[in-house]
Amino acid sequence: LPDSDIWREQQCKLPYGGELVNTDTRNTSYTARAQVDYSFQFLEDHQITVVAGTEARSSKYKGLKSTEYGYLPDRGEKFVEIDPVQWPKYGDLVKSHPNVITNTLTNVMSWYGTFTYDYMNRYIVNFNIRADGSNKFGQDKSNRFLPIWSVSGRWNLHEEAFLKEVMWMNMFAFRGSYGIQGNVSPDQTPNLLIQLGSFDPISKQYISKLSKLPNPQLRWEKTTSWNFGVDFAFLDNRLNGSVEVYRKKGKDQIISKEVASTTGSTTMQLNAGNLENKGYEIVLNVVPVKTKDITWALNINGARNINKVTKSGITTDYGYKEYLDGSAVIPGEALNTFYSYKYDRLDANGLPTFKDIEETDGITQTEMFAKVFAYSGTRVPDITGGFGTDISYKNLAIGGFFSYSLGTKIRLNNLYNDSGQRLPQPQQNMNQAFVNRWKQPGDENRTDIPVLTTDPLDMYGLGIDRKIKIADNGWEMYNKSDLRVASGNYLRLKNLYVRYNFSDRICHKIRAQMISVRFEATNLWLLADKKLKGQDPEQVTLGGVSTPPTSSYTLGLDITF
């Protein structure tokens, strides 16, 4: 065969036809509730409301997802039989996308009650209590039902007698709350789960494997939180908004822990993590201009959240991949914190080199990783928010909204594959960055893009006989080095609209209540780190490729009769 045909058979995943994906899901849910409400007033100004009830919920989800390859819809909806021996990549594709059957049952039993006291709509106190039980927890009866409760209060200052005559104050209030909440993930179970597989033609036996190890002590994730806020509205509501501060402490967070493979699995779900979140939220709305024909409104919102792992509950050392992808839960650091190799330079042959990767006798894995990796940041932003404006003149309205994000770091998409990089086949695309690659001795002084080569650059290629594994090869290290980390801060024009409402005279001609024409556009403009070079900062990946937010344009005509 010609070289191109040999390459095609070796590399092509789907030589003929397309994919036919069948998805069949059924969800059956039942809910039964009994509730009693009682409210009474005494001494004219005092109001008490009491609610008590119980609720039972059951939800059964069953689904089947299958993918068939070689589908020819234009040829009688037939399938091509493809030989996986001749087309090995096709065989890998089929193995990586097996048919999936989902069958889950979730049962929840709840009791709840509320007590509310209201004095002249001036002082309001509320107390809530609830107990939920779920089949997602273990045999320990003390862990099945978690009583969660909260107490909150509100002081409407604008209802006070000394502020009743302040005409410019429409509303001014303080509020606060304290309580305990519980959470359960639908993916968790205390029971031993065995995944029944298909038939193995080699051993002539059916295949089964452990999916989840049993944990009878599995219990609710608990969060203790408090918040304090101020709500206000002044000048006939032309200036209004709110400010809130909060703090949340999570306990018994469910995390994945590595266990000995002799148990039949490599991980186990445990209540072992503690997490703290604190921050504030601000919302402000202003109407600077409001006349008979013109209205101009501004709005802005922002939020800052700081999270920190106070306890990980993990005694087993993490592998290097957990540090790279941000899944390592490290006390004192934020969740989703990731680390990178320390890029040094290109050598005289155009190959990447890295700092502090030499192995020292007697060094532990944790100590080695602390030397090899550099802190890169977190994938979760510290500050998020947006601001916008709306302007209307008679029947014409124009508006837009910007969103922003600060404090996050992201990886650039992988530049090399795990076996290096070579010149592509004519039908393949290539990253534009390779235009500035190393091509000849001396180029290492002008570029940080390595040479095109088939050298796998494994750890022995780096000249290191490793006892503690820090990477699969040098190309993985380059892709996940601090050189390939960029700021995720951005300012985006999220949407823009223009709308025109036709006059009542025109509407009456066709007996319509309202006629309007509108144009809307989303994701029109982006200000971000130049280092991204077209990669979208909201395309949060750690080396993989995903589809960024796309721009869209809509022209519509709305008629209401």
Task: List PLM regions with ranges.
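Conserved small-residue
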Residues: 65-72, 270, 280, 287-379, ...
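C-terminal substrate/ligand-recognition segments
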Residues: 382-407, 482-504
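Extended hydrophobic/aromatic-rich secondary-structure runs
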Residues: 1-19, 127, 364-366, 375-380, ...
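Short helix/loop capping segments that flank catalytic or ligand/cofactor-binding pockets
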Residues: 51, 60-62, 185, 339, ...
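C-terminal beta-signal and adjacent terminal beta-strands/loops
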Residues: 167, 308, 363, 392-476, ...
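Extracellular/periplasmic, surface-exposed regions of secreted and cell-surface proteins
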Residues: 1, 12-333, 476, 480-561
